[in-house]
Curated annotation (Swiss-Prot):
Protein name: PTS system lactose-specific EIIA component
Highest taxon listed in the record's lineage: Bacteria
Record keywords: Cytoplasm, Magnesium, Metal-binding, Phosphoprotein, Phosphotransferase system, Sugar transport, Transferase, Transport
One GO location term (cellular component): cytoplasm
Active site: H78 (tele-phosphohistidine intermediate)
Length: 103
C-alpha cells in the first residue's frame, strides 16, 4: 500500500471519528436537556460513524496481515488517535447518560 492510499484511509478515519465525536457531544447536550430519545438517536448515528471508521482501519490491518508493505503516514496516526479518543468518549457517554437519567 503506497503512502497516498494510507493517507486516504487516515483521512477517512479522521472524518468518521470526528463525525462520531460530534454526534456523541450533541447527544450529551440533548441528555442534559432531558431529551433522551434524541440523545439515543444521536448515539446511534455516532455508532454508525465509528463502524465506518473501523471499516477503514480494518482494511488497512487486513492488508498488513496479508504481507503488504504499509507506508508510514502521520495522517493515519492522527486518524488512529481520533478514533481512540472517540471510542473513549463513547464509553464515557454510557455512564454520563445514566447520571442524567437518574436526575
Amino acid at each position: 500500500m503506497n503512502r497516498e492510499e494510507v493517507q486516504l484511509l487516515g483521512f477517512e478515519i479522521v472524518a468518521f471519528a470526528g463525525d462520531a465525536r460530534s454526534k456523541f457531544l450533541e447527544a450529551l447536550t440533548a441528555a442534559q436537556a432531558g431529551d433522551f430519545a434524541k440523545a439515543d438517536a444521536l448515539i446511534e448515528e455516532g455508532n454508525n460513524c465509528i463502524a465506518e471508521a473501523h471499516r477503514a482501519q480494518t482494511s488497512l490491518l487486513a492488508k498488513e496481515a496479508q504481507g503488504d508493505d504499509i507506508a508510514y503516514s502521520v495522517t493515519m496516526m492522527h486518524g488512529q488517535d481520533h478514533l481512540m479518543t472517540t471510542i473513549l468518549l463513547k464509553d464515557l457517554m454510557k455512564h454520563l447518560l445514566e447520571f442524567y437519567k437518574r436526575g
